[in-house]
């Protein structure tokens, strides 16, 4: 499967608790931290929920 790189670019401080939990569930902690995840519907849904806080890149 394809993979995506997710980078936390904005702080979740002051966001609603569900968005903060989504950031943690994606494995992101500090600003500019990145994780590589499988590109599937579940991960895409989580990314869409916090799209204003993260950037997404395709990994080859």
UniProtKB/Swiss-Prot annotation:
Q: Give the GO biological process terms.
A: translation
SUPFAM superfamilies associated with the record:
Ribosomal protein L30p/L7e
Record's GO cellular component, any one? cytosolic large ribosomal subunit
A single Pfam family, by name? Ribosomal_L30
The record, for PROSITE patterns, names:
RIBOSOMAL_L30 (PS00634)
Q: Which GO MF terms does the UniProt record name?
A: structural constituent of ribosome
Q: What interactions and quaternary structure are annotated?
A: Part of the 50S ribosomal subunit.
Spell out the protein name for this chain.
Large ribosomal subunit protein uL30
């Amino acid at each position: 499967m394809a993979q995506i790189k997710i980078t936390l670019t904005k702080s979740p401080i002051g966001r609603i608790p569900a968005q903060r939990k989504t950031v943690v569930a994606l494995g992101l902690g500090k600003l500019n931290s990145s994780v590589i995840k499988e590109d599937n519907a579940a991960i895409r849904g989580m990314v869409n929920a916090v799209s204003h806080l993260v950037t997404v890149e395709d990994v080859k």
